[in-house]
Each structure stands twice: as C-alpha cells, then as structure tokens.
Amino acid sequence: MARAGESGRAGVRRSTAPSRRTGGARAAADAVRAELRRRLEPSLTTAGFDLEDVSVTRAGARSVVRVVVDRDGGIDLDAVADASRLVSAVLDGEDIGTDGAGGTGGSGGAAGGSGASPISGAYVLEVTSPGVDRPLVEPRHWRRAVGRLVVVRRADGVEVEGRVLSADDEGADLAVPTAPARRGRPVRRRIERVVYATVARAAVQVEFGSATDADGDTDVDADAGAELPAGAELPAGADLGLGAESDVDLDEGLEDDDGLEDEDDEDEYGAAGGGAPAGSAADEVVEDHGAVDTEAGLIGRTGKEMNR
C-alpha cells in the first residue's frame, strides 16, 4: 500500500511478518528433532546415558546430526564411542523396535514413517559429551556440578557466584564469599540455598587456576546473618573440602592451546538439554554416513567414514 510521506515522496509499507516458508522450515526441523529424541532416548537410557540434546543442521548436500550425551560418574571417549555406535544403529534402522513398527524402510526415508529413518540422504553424525561450561538446566546437571564454581542469575536479575556444595531435586546449596579475599586472612563464605524454580540461567565457570584459596583456610557461614568460626561443624553434606589442603583442582593441567577466548553459552535456561557450545565438548566421535572405506586416526576425536 503506497502513501505520501512528509517529504512528498510516496512510500511503500512492507509486511514484516515471517514468511510461510521460514515458519514451515522451522516446524519441519522441530518435528525431525522431536522424532530423533523419541527414537534415541529409550536406547540411550537403557545403556546408562542421558540424552542432553539433539539437533540437525544442513552442510551442503548433507545433514549434520549432533547428539550430546552424558552419564553419572563422568564420560570419556570410550563411552562416547559406545553411544555413537548405538545412535548410528538406531538411525540406520538396526535398532528401531521400541514402537513395534514394521521394516526399516530403506535408506533416506521420510520422518513421517514409523520405521523409516527421520534423516533423508547422507548425513554426518557427531556424538559428543557436554562442555564443562554447559548451562545447568536439570537437577542432574547440578548434582554433577558439585564442587564446581557456578554463576546463577535469578529471575529478579540478581547474580550469585559460588561453589556447589550439594544438590537435590528442588535446589542446590552454594558456598558464596561474603567479602573479597584478603592476604593472610581466611575467606569467609555463607551457605546460600538456590531454588531451581527461581533461576533464570545458571552455568559452570571454567577454572584454569586452583579452586582453592591461596591464603589459609576457608570459613563458611551458616547463613547470611550468622557466621561459623573456623573449624565449626557444617550441616550434613555441606563440607566438601573448601580448605586449601583438601580441595581438588578439577582443571589442573589444562592449557588454552588455541588462544581462543571462552564464550558464554547464549542458550536460554529453559532450553531443553542445555547443549554445550561448539568446541567445548570434552570428547567427540564423528561418523560420515555417505562415503566409502575411509578411516581417519584417533587424535582427540575419532572420525569414521561409513557407507549407508
């Protein structure tokens, strides 16, 4: 619709609503993602893995399927390789039996069929573990972060930084410094309860130095108003070795070889799974389902070319 502006020239008002094509593509991607999660989660859970995130993107003529898995007690490259074989079998139709559907449907099936693969054509499968700095979304993420330094942004905008002492299904207890560290003086901390329902975003902080205080022991306050003297007994489960002698450097020996700066994950707290940023995963296995008879060596990540 044309209209005359103040300058006397005609202006054209254009619609800013999203196109149907964009909305349709997003809906189709969400449907494929949901179908992948529905198929993969039962098998991964049975094998002792948690499916943290799954996504599908396009890279030229191929699709890139990225699956993030974790498990209690930590995950190493061997475990990631096991998860990769399991995911590959499910996607290739070798282990789709949870819904009692018919045959595998052949290669490149559409997502709508119960027995067909949700991925059309050739694809690259990436199975990774979460990065150290991944967002804390589920209670299990908090339990696995016990002993780590986290930053929490509450729904009211207040930020809290502290070390996770313990976590349950409702919230976590943090040891929060009450004052800046002073040389020759013990650092005093208070125990603050963080309820998951009040959290807008929370993430583990990457620590390249020691997690301990270099100067003396650490005093922990029972709450914001009452201080416990050094050596006083803490509530059950709260004393996790905050002292200089008993704390463990979880990142000892890690070096930033590539010189890249760490970036905060911009995913919202409510995003399902809380996938880690690219490059931050501890271990990764990549499979290319579209080439023939090519093998790459194991150098921190495993590449395997497969014919689908």
Swiss-Prot record:
Q: What does this protein do?
A: Required for maturation of 30S ribosomal subunits.
Its source organism is Parafrankia sp. (strain EAN1pec)
**GO CC: one term?**
cytosol
Please list the residue ranges that the record marks as compositionally biased, kind Gly residues.
Answer: 99-113
- Keyword Cytoplasm listed: yes
Claim: Cytoplasm is one of the keywords in the record: yes
Q: Name one GO biological process term.
A: ribosomal small subunit assembly
Per the record, where are the segments of Low complexity compositional bias? 17-31
Biased amino acid composition, Acidic residues: 249-269
Keywords, sorted A to Z: Cytoplasm, Ribosome biogenesis
Return the annotated region ranges for Disordered: 1-31, 94-113, 249-308
Subcellular location, record wording: Cytoplasm
Family designation: Belongs to the RimP family.
Any Pfam family: RimP_N
Under the heading HAMAP family, the entry gives: RimP
Q: Which InterPro entries match?
A: Ribosome_maturation_RimP (IPR003728), RimP_N (IPR028989), RimP_N_sf (IPR035956)
Protein known as: Ribosome maturation factor RimP
